[in-house]
């Protein structure tokens, strides 16, 4: 009895020390309670991804006994390689290793894909929670994890919500470069994402955010307060932790206000940086919402045959060109699983004028 009590007391003493180490902000890398969840999940996802990318056997992604190879050992390279999504025969079923009769069956049906994405999604949620936790411990505001929620929402949209809406994890995004582009083409063909307002907002956020970032960085760099001689780098004029401003915001404000107009320039550094953070974040949120709506087939606008003349004859537009391109991509997608999409059998084909008429 004495020995057992001593062992339990030593364990109880070790637990508070472990808790203190986990939540300590003095560590070189903060762990946190969310990190306790994040680290093993991301490690499991990364290890399985690397092994599957190198050596996974072909996967019967369409469920028609025609496996698709995605690993290095089966002839792929860094561009064409991917972790192929789980089989359409599995659908939305949870498919851990113990659900398969053999390991070969699990690999053939694309089990590694589910293992990677589930651990990855839990891991990035843990990373987001860890960002909030560290901000809380340091007395900071929580906006860092709010900004990070944008890519988290995008990952959940393509890896979880979209397969749920389409009815199978085989419709999820493959984990590879060519697989990602294939996913984008198929998404355009089936949902016309280019004509969805939320996708347009996402494009505006990405390009606009890049533009604003470049503008802000160049303005700050151009209005630095010189603390060095002409022969030294201006970077040496900054000391980490200094209280003085490192650039002249009045000069930057005046330059940009005269370049465009006065009210296009921020005169408040805090509101400026909040805008730089929130603009791309909100736009990526909207894009994720668009993916989630299209997952349930609430698709982008279709302007096919939308313009007619006084006689009721269709006037071909670029909307018809886009629709024809979508049909072409849809025909090529899963061409062995079905002969052609029903869209092609719905109506007679209409010619699209892409060449100028001959004159004379």
From Swiss-Prot:
Its EC number is 1.10.3.9. A quinone binds at residues 216, 265-266. It catalyses: 2 a plastoquinone + 4 hnu + 2 H2O = 2 a plastoquinol + O2. Chlorophyll a ChlzD1 binds at residue 119. One of its GO terms (cellular component) is plasma membrane-derived thylakoid membrane. The record marks 191 as: Stabilizes free radical intermediate. Fe cation binds at residues 216, 273. The D1/D2 heterodimer binds P680, chlorophylls that are the primary electron donor of PSII, and subsequent electron acceptors. It shares a non-heme iron and each subunit binds pheophytin, quinone, additional chlorophylls, carotenoids and lipids. D1 provides most of the ligands for the Mn4-Ca-O5 cluster of the oxygen-evolving complex (OEC). There is also a Cl(-1) ion associated with D1 and D2, which is required for oxygen evolution. The PSII complex binds additional chlorophylls, carotenoids and specific lipids. PSII is composed of 1 copy each of membrane proteins PsbA, PsbB, PsbC, PsbD, PsbE, PsbF, PsbH, PsbI, PsbJ, PsbK, PsbL, PsbM, PsbT, PsbX, PsbY, Psb30/Ycf12, peripheral proteins PsbO, CyanoQ (PsbQ), PsbU, PsbV and a large number of cofactors. It forms dimeric complexes. Cyanobacteria usually contain more than 2 copies of the psbA gene. This is Photosystem II protein D1. It comes from Prochlorococcus marinus (strain SARG / CCMP1375 / SS120). The gene is psbA.
């Amino acid at each position: 009895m004495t020995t057992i009590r001593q062992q339990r007391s030593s364990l109880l003493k070790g637990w508070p020390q472990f808790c203190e180490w986990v939540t300590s902000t003095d560590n070189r890398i903060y762990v946190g309670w969310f990190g306790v969840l994040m680290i093993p999940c991301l490690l499991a996802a990364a290890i399985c991804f690397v092994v599957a990318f190198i050596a996974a056997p072909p996967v019967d992604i369409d469920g028609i006994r025609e496996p698709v190879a995605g690993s290095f050992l089966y002839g792929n390279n860094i561009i064409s390689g991917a972790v192929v999504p789980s089989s359409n025969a599995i659908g939305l079923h949870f498919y851990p290793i113990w659900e398969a009769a053999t390991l070969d069956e699990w690999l053939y049906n694309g089990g590694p894909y589910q293992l990677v994405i589930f651990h990855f999604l839990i891991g990035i949620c843990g990373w987001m929670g860890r960002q909030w936790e560290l901000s809380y411990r340091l007395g900071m505001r929580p906006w860092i994890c709010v900004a990070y929620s944008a890519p988290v929402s995008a990952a959940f949209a393509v890896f979880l919500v979209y397969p749920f809406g389409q009815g199978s994890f085989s419709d999820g995004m493959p984990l590879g470069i060519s697989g990602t582009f294939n996913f984008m083409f198929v998404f355009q063909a089936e949902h016309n994402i280019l004509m969805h307002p939320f996708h347009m907002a996402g494009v505006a956020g990405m390009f606009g955010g890049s533009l604003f970032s470049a503008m802000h960085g160049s303005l700050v760099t151009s209005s630095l307060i010189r603390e060095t001689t002409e022969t030294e780098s201006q970077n040496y004029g900054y000391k980490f932790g200094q209280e003085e401003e490192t650039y002249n915001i009045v000069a930057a404000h005046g330059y940009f206000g005269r370049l465009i107009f006065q009210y296009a320039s921020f005169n408040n550094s805090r509101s400026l940086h909040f805008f730089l953070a929130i603009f791309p974040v909100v736009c990526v949120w909207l894009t994720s919402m668009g993916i989630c709506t299209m997952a349930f087939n609430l698709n982008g606008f279709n302007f096919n045959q939308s313009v007619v003349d006084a006689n009721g004859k269709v006037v071909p537009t670029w909307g018809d060109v886009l629709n024809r391109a979508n049909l072409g991509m849809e025909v090529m997608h899963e061409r062995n699983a079905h002969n052609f999409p029903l869209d092609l059998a719905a109506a007679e084909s209409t010619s699209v004028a892409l060449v100028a008429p001959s004159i004379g």
